[in-house]
Regions:
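Sec/Tat signal peptide C-region and signal peptidase I cleavage site
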Residues: 18-22
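Bacterial N-terminal signal peptides that target proteins for export
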Residues: 1-8
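Bacterial N-terminal signal peptides
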Residues: 8-17
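Amphipathic, charged alpha-helical segments and their helix-to-coil junctions
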Residues: 23-171
Length: 171
């Protein structure tokens, strides 16, 4: 009888200790959260406006290059070799300046990237802070982002804490 009591006591202690090491998981959908943040929607609209403006500026500059080339081709028979060389250099120089402008606006460290950093990064930081607060408050070990490349074949909707993050952000 005593061995059974000891066995039950040992089993209970073992089960309780395993349960205390259980980790809590949750997930959020940052794409969903971002669509619910008005500042993000406004920032995206501003970025799209800048992008369209810069794109039309670049397209107009490329049209100038094409017009220069068509003019050169039509007048080529009348030009001396020295004049041809100058025109070709002029066209090449103009094309390089348009490519530089395109890189300035849309390059990896271009104006579009900087605008995105200025307008969207603060919103992403607020989301990150709210997720950290949620994790600390509810003692979550891991919070996944459902909108990232992480493949979630199944997730319990009760574990989706996106609305809680929005609430912590004041939305």
């Amino acid at each position: 009888m005593k061995t059974i009591q000891k066995l039950i006591l040992l089993s209970s202690i073992l089960l309780l200790s395993i349960n205390s090491y259980a980790q809590k998981f949750a997930y959020v959908d940052t794409d969903y959260i971002l669509t619910k943040v008005p500042e993000f929607v406004q920032a995206e609209e501003k970025i799209n406006e800048f992008s369209k403006q810069w794109q039309s500026e670049i397209e107009a500059a490329y049209q100038d290059v094409e017009q220069m080339y068509r003019t050169y081709q039509s007048e080529q028979v009348l030009l001396t070799s020295e004049m041809k060389t100058k025109r070709e250099e002029s066209i090449i120089e103009k094309e390089k300046s348009v490519q530089a402008l395109q890189q300035k606006y849309f390059g990896t460290q271009g104006e579009l990237y900087k605008k995105r950093q200025d307008l969207i990064k603060p919103i992403q930081d607020r989301i990150f802070d709210a997720v950290q607060q949620l994790a600390a408050t509810n003692k979550y070990s891991i919070i996944f982002d459902a909108s990232s490349d992480l493949i979630m074949l199944y997730s319990n909707p009760d574990l989706d804490k996106s609305d809680k993050v929005l609430e912590l952000m004041g939305y």
